[in-house]
């Protein structure tokens, strides 16, 4: 599966400022060449170090991906840091030629997708400012082969660049839902298989079989801690949730009561901004 990111990249003049208003490089849609355009995740990531910021609500995530697509395919929206707040004034679907930079564009997309303006930020303080909105989970470090979902915001760990995933894995999948609980919050089948060679040998990347194993066995095996999905470790979750320990008891060293902690996070914890890694 090819993952795509959208972002405000650079002016047609090859500089951060001084370009004509609007996207001078866009020639067609979907736009993969413009000042504001899409590119593959691998070309977006390059060699830099990144954080991933994920919306708490699936609907917001899907809306963020759609918002960035609208922006990337809008020929009236170009790149120029000297007029970076133009997109805030006119919006991502503007019919008036205007400008943005990478951070102001993400701000505008968040506003379009959620109805909330998180305020001005740059790549230096994006994690803090976006996090204060209450709309997103705690930022996590990007790792190679991490499952990136449509709507995920990816920002450099230091001053640099920021964008939104326009085409990634869907958080609306029903394949990881069991008895009304979405275990996709704690289980990434590909990650689970890759981190557990015995399971990969037995099941390959079969989502149904890996979910079944997780629910029957893996969730209660300490040897699987930190090996179900990149951004959730049940041991960390339990150790930083003393209120849950009072209800469920301490997490046993063999992991045999792990299921209740996994299930709690899927049903409640992921919306409560609890620490998971």
Regions found by a protein language model. Name each.
Residues 142-147:
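Short, surface-exposed secondary-structure edge patches
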Residues 1-113, 158-161, 169-180:
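N-terminal capping segments
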């Amino acid at each position: 599966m090819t993952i795509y990111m959208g972002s405000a990249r650079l002016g047609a003049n090859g500089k951060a400022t001084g370009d004509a208003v609007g996207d001078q490089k866009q020639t067609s849609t979907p736009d993969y060449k413009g000042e504001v355009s899409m590119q593959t995740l691998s070309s977006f990531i390059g060699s830099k170090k990144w954080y991933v910021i994920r919306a708490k609500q699936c609907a917001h995530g899907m809306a963020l991906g759609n918002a960035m697509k609208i922006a990337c395919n809008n020929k009236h929206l170009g790149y120029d840091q000297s007029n970076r707040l133009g997109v805030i004034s006119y919006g991502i679907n503007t019919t008036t030629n205007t400008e943005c930079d990478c951070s102001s564009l993400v701000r505008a997309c968040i506003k379009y997708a959620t109805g909330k303006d998180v305020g001005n930020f740059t790549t230096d303080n994006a994690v803090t400012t976006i996090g204060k909105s209450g709309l997103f989970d705690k930022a996590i470090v990007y790792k190679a082969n991490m499952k990136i979902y449509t709507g995920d915001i990816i920002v450099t760990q230091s001053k640099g660049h920021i964008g939104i995933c326009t085409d990634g894995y869907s958080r609306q999948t029903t394949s990881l839902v069991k008895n009304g609980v979405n275990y996709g919050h704690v289980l990434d089948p590909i990650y689970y298989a890759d981190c557990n060679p015995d399971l990969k040998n037995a099941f390959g990347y079969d989502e149904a079989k890996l979910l079944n194993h997780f629910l029957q066995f893996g969730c209660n095996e300490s040897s699987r801690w930190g090996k179900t999905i990149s951004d959730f470790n049940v041991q960390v979750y339990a150790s930083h949730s003393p209120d849950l320990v009072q209800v469920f008891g301490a997490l046993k060293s063999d992991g045999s009561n792990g299921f209740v902690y996994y299930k709690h996070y899927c049903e409640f914890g992921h919306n409560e901004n609890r620490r998971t890694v």
